[in-house]
Amino acid sequence: MELGCPELLEPPEDIFSTGSFLELGFNGPASKVPVTRGLQKSEPDDFLNLFIDPNMIHCSETSPGRDSGVSEDPGSPAQQASSSPALYEVVYDSGTLQGTQREAGPTFGLISIQIDQWTPALMVPDACTVSGLPSDSHRHILPRVSTRAPAPPAAMPSCQHHLFLTDEEKQLLAQEGITLPSHLPLTKAEERILKKIRRKIRNKQSAQDSRRRKKEYLDGLESRVAACSEQNQKLQRKVQELERQNIFLMEQVRQLQKLTAQTSSRAAQTSTCVLILLFSLALIILPSFSPFQGQSEARPEDYQLHGVISRNILTHENVTENLESPVLKSKLEELPEAPTTNGSTKTHLKMRVKARPPGQIRGMVHTDEM
């Protein structure tokens, strides 16, 4: 492509005219554009080099009060754009300018051209596309025909947002045979599919978590069961040992009971024997200690018989005859020989019997026998 024709340096009137800008929704530029003043036909090396950077192409909506061109007329009406047409920034080399701009070094400028339905492939070949601008310390920027500030990040369209999918989401989409675009926005059907896939992934993760927790719980239970079984075995062995010790102690207790029974029976026998001996000794020794032993024996003369209330026993006539019998006589003779304290009384009675009648003798004998 030969860029030596000077006609390419002058923009056509139908594109940069005020009417065309008003139709596109922008304020028209001034009648005299400073870009057109300037290039010599004798300098073919400084012709316009057209570079279009795809990274500088962006979509934005025109604000209601923003001017699309450099206009000195304050009374020009501001119109709102009904749509968001594409805005392309063209980088050109203006070369050495005549008149007031005769400094050394080339100058560069930017022209913002709004194209409604043109495509970059029809405008500029791929060979003219570069990713950067040449750097130069002596650079002069020409006034723009149309200046436009870049849109803020919030106003940037969603076409620049990429859709990031995880490997698991990609795998599930591939299994279901569904392909999603890599850029946003998505349609409602695609959003539903993506939500469904993510819901499946969440359910899968929750199921895995529940299975993991269940496995951990079961492992903990198994370890506790093993520890409890081991402790139970130890306790069983200890119980068996204690049972053996208990049996041994019971045998010893039985033997001790037998020994204590024998010793207790022997002790009871000895104690009873000792008590019997003491009681017999007491019976033998106590009668010798009489309270009347220290007194003098009573004489027959000192003893006086007093009247005693006694029973009157009926006697038979044969009793008087029995008194004369030798048996009674022998008894009466034996009375003085008895070693008793009342021997004197019996002797006195015997002495008095002879002087009394037979009836009185029978009464005295009866009282003596009583």
Curated annotation (Swiss-Prot):
<feature type="region of interest" description="Disordered">
    <location>
        <begin position="61"/>
        <end position="85"/>
    </location>
</feature>
<feature type="topological domain" description="Cytoplasmic">
    <location>
        <begin position="1"/>
        <end position="271"/>
    </location>
</feature>
<dbReference type="InterPro" id="IPR004827">
    <property type="entry name" value="bZIP"/>
</dbReference>
<feature type="region of interest" description="Leucine-zipper">
    <location>
        <begin position="235"/>
        <end position="256"/>
    </location>
</feature>
<keyword id="KW-0325">Glycoprotein</keyword>
<comment type="subunit">
    <text>Binds DNA as a dimer. Forms a heterodimer with CREM isoform Tau.</text>
</comment>
<keyword id="KW-0539">Nucleus</keyword>
<feature type="site" description="Cleavage; by PS1">
    <location>
        <begin position="314"/>
        <end position="315"/>
    </location>
</feature>
<keyword id="KW-1133">Transmembrane helix</keyword>
<dbReference type="InterPro" id="IPR051381">
    <property type="entry name" value="CREB_ATF_subfamily"/>
</dbReference>
<keyword id="KW-0744">Spermatogenesis</keyword>
<dbReference type="GO" id="GO:0031965">
    <property type="term" value="C:nuclear membrane"/>
</dbReference>
<dbReference type="GO" id="GO:0001228">
    <property type="term" value="F:DNA-binding transcription activator activity, RNA polymerase II-specific"/>
</dbReference>
<feature type="compositionally biased region" description="Low complexity">
    <location>
        <begin position="76"/>
        <end position="85"/>
    </location>
</feature>
<feature type="region of interest" description="Required for transcriptional activation">
    <location>
        <begin position="1"/>
        <end position="55"/>
    </location>
</feature>
<keyword id="KW-0238">DNA-binding</keyword>
<dbReference type="GO" id="GO:0005783">
    <property type="term" value="C:endoplasmic reticulum"/>
</dbReference>
<keyword id="KW-0221">Differentiation</keyword>
<feature type="glycosylation site" description="N-linked (GlcNAc...) asparagine">
    <location>
        <position position="342"/>
    </location>
</feature>
<dbReference type="Pfam" id="PF00170">
    <property type="entry name" value="bZIP_1"/>
</dbReference>
<dbReference type="GO" id="GO:0000139">
    <property type="term" value="C:Golgi membrane"/>
</dbReference>
<keyword id="KW-0010">Activator</keyword>
<keyword id="KW-0812">Transmembrane</keyword>
<comment type="function">
    <text>Transcriptional activator that may play a role in the unfolded protein response of the testis. Proposed to be involved in spermiogenesis. May be involved in regulating the maturation of sperm head nuclei. Alternatively proposed to be a paternally delivered transcription factor that may function in early zygotic gene activation. Increases the binding of CREM isoform Tau with CRE. The CREM isoform Tau-CREB3L4 heterodimer functions through CRE but not through UPRE and may recruit HIRA to CRE to regulate histone exchange.</text>
</comment>
<dbReference type="GO" id="GO:0005789">
    <property type="term" value="C:endoplasmic reticulum membrane"/>
</dbReference>
<dbReference type="GO" id="GO:0006986">
    <property type="term" value="P:response to unfolded protein"/>
</dbReference>
<dbReference type="GO" id="GO:0030154">
    <property type="term" value="P:cell differentiation"/>
</dbReference>
<comment type="similarity">
    <text>Belongs to the bZIP family. ATF subfamily.</text>
</comment>
<protein>
    <recommendedName>
        <fullName>Cyclic AMP-responsive element-binding protein 3-like protein 4</fullName>
    </recommendedName>
</protein>
<feature type="topological domain" description="Lumenal">
    <location>
        <begin position="293"/>
        <end position="370"/>
    </location>
</feature>
<keyword id="KW-0256">Endoplasmic reticulum</keyword>
<dbReference type="GO" id="GO:0005829">
    <property type="term" value="C:cytosol"/>
</dbReference>
<feature type="region of interest" description="Basic motif">
    <location>
        <begin position="195"/>
        <end position="234"/>
    </location>
</feature>
<keyword id="KW-0217">Developmental protein</keyword>
<keyword id="KW-0834">Unfolded protein response</keyword>
<dbReference type="GO" id="GO:0005739">
    <property type="term" value="C:mitochondrion"/>
</dbReference>
<keyword id="KW-0735">Signal-anchor</keyword>
<dbReference type="GO" id="GO:0005654">
    <property type="term" value="C:nucleoplasm"/>
</dbReference>
<feature type="domain" description="bZIP">
    <location>
        <begin position="193"/>
        <end position="256"/>
    </location>
</feature>
<keyword id="KW-0968">Cytoplasmic vesicle</keyword>
<keyword id="KW-0804">Transcription</keyword>
<dbReference type="GO" id="GO:0002079">
    <property type="term" value="C:inner acrosomal membrane"/>
</dbReference>
